[in-house]
Amino acid sequence: MKALFRACRIGKVMLRYRLDTLLDGTAAERWLRLAKPFVPRISAEIVEQSRGRRLRLALQELGPIFVKFGQILSTRRDLVPQDIGDELVMLQDRVEPFEGQTARIIIETALGKSVESAFAHFDTVPLASASISQVHAATLHDGREVVVKVLRPDIEHQISDDIALLKSLATLVEHTHPNADKIRPCEIVAEIETTLAAELDLQREGANASVLRRFWEASDDIYVPEVIWSHTAEQVLTLERMYGIPSDDIALLDASGIDRKALSSKGIRVFYTQVFRDNFFHADAHSGNIWVDSDPARKSNPRFIALDFGIMGQLSQKDQYYLAENFMAIFHKDYRRIAELHVEAGWIPPHVRIEELEAAARSVCEPYFTRPLSQISLAEVLMKLFHVARRYQLTLQPQLILLQKTLLNIEGVGRQLDPELDIWVVARPVLERILRARYSPRHALKELNKRLPEIMTHAPDTPRLIHTWLVQQVESRKQNDVYLQQIRALAMTLQGLQRRVVNAIVGSGLLVAAAVLYGLHPDGLYLGAIPVWSLISGCVGALALFSAWWRS
């Protein structure tokens, strides 16, 4: 019943914001039309709004889960039209906060102690409020300033209910919408469910921050705040407090004298290093989560501050290698290699013709190379390649989609900081250096040394395993020979059966012909009272039937 009321409310909000037009041609559209008389008249102000703005306002009204839905949609530019994607970006961190007293109760329950014993000071007025959690300022008893991230109350049940409802709606749209194969609603909902599950465990987010901090502890390019583990639990995360400037606040960056050119190049270098050196990248890197250190001493050598570690990405070694090779092939305009890599990586079925895939890659990439270098986007090229490859049954791991949208965000931040940023010039040497180091003899020896204990542990079992494998191969070959003989016998049986069926059909036909000729009394030779041709036909037919019967 609760789900029904929730569905009715969603339908009502959709009608009020005229979002039923997005479902034209579906079964849902007909149901929404029936409900129109029960919804207040649409105001002229709403009617005049763009569809993207109407969708954004509706998602805000429906609550935090639908805000998160919009946030994820805003990053899937391969699925969402540009006008809608641009509007949904504005959903980032614009959610009403919950009561500070409620936050205190959640903290005390999670940490098992009072707020007063955990903190010297705790501000009940939140610094920021997002769709899943909100952040409060606090001070530890040792004087350190921290921020405390607290999950929204009862958010798990609300997410579970809304996800179940979204799955039902997605299934309905997938079966009824004429463009469902392009929209892929079930895929979007599955991604939302995975993303939300990761963001609901703040202890996991703390672990992500801790790993990222370890990788970049000695860097001048990016700073990751320290996790205060003694004040962290599944529903509460306490981090060192940072002061900085949002990376999209260009006016304040200029007023602070920050070298934006140097900063934009650092952002690209950090991203490629995270992906190809560390294989652990920040996958929610929009401007709200990427700040710039406001320390006056860092004007000429600025650094980023990373925030919000709920979504991190990792690639398999195979995907990491093929992605790096793809980038290098794009740099060198080697379309044949791009096509081969898509097949070798298993992203495209092997039966697809390489020449056809090469032509598709050329049609995607060449228009980009006619632009000035400062206007070329690797994220767009990669997105278009993946989009075109869908025609050839492209299969991608979700982490690759995550990387593509993160690259889009990073390039957006970089271009905001420096509109003339040449991403290719910055990214190429970083990628080449990382690949040289990664596939160098020194790195191979390091990996061998790391695996040496494992190799030594399994070494005594190696002769036995080899012997077992050889025995299996011999037995398998014998078994294959038996199967082959059985198949040959079956083939001969089928051939014999086919001949008998043919003989039976021919014999029956000739006997029928003999009977017809006998009844017609044709002119010609007779043997007694029987026409010769009838006699011949009958004899041959009888022989054919006897042959079919005898072989059975």
From Swiss-Prot:
Active site residues of this protein: 284 (proton acceptor)
Membrane topology: Multi-pass membrane protein
MF (Gene Ontology): ATP binding; protein kinase activity
Binding-site residues for ATP, renumbered to this chain: 127-135, 149
Domain Protein kinase: 121-504
GO cellular component: plasma membrane
Subcellular location(s) of the protein: Cell inner membrane
Stretches that traverse the bilayer: 501-521, 526-546
Origin superkingdom: Bacteria
Enzyme Commission number(s) from the entry: 2.7.-.-
Matches recorded under Pfam families: ABC1 (PF03109)
GO BP term, example: regulation of ubiquinone biosynthetic process
Broad enzyme group: transferase
Record-linked PANTHER family: CHAPERONE-ACTIVITY OF BC1 COMPLEX CABC1 -RELATED, PROTEIN ACTIVITY OF BC1 COMPLEX KINASE 7, CHLOROPLASTIC
NCBIfam families linked to this entry: PRK04750.1 (NF003404), UbiB (TIGR01982)
Function: Is probably a protein kinase regulator of UbiI activity which is involved in aerobic coenzyme Q (ubiquinone) biosynthesis.
Full protein name: Probable protein kinase UbiB
Gene name tied to this protein: ubiB
